[in-house]
Amino acid sequence: MSNNETIYESVIADLLKEIDRATAKHPFFPCRKHPAFVLIAEEYLELTRAINDNESDARVIEEAFHTAVTLLRFITEKRKNPDLHAENERIEEK
């Protein structure tokens, strides 16, 4: 196993732990695009602030994980409930 594989495995393991933590803390994830977009934007802005404010690497990585988890939860919900999302999109168009 190369060093990159080891690093990727470690990151993925940490990401899975963070997904479990986030899901336990916030079990509901919005299905409509607009509320989901707001959550994604908030996490991205927190990551951007951590970088721009020269916060510690640990803090930047923490915010990067939060952003990644939010994106993964969005993707997961889209795949789990495609009919629900299609219905929500029709409702939003009215």
Predicted regions and their residues:
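Flexible "arm" and connector segments at domain edges
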Residues: 1-94
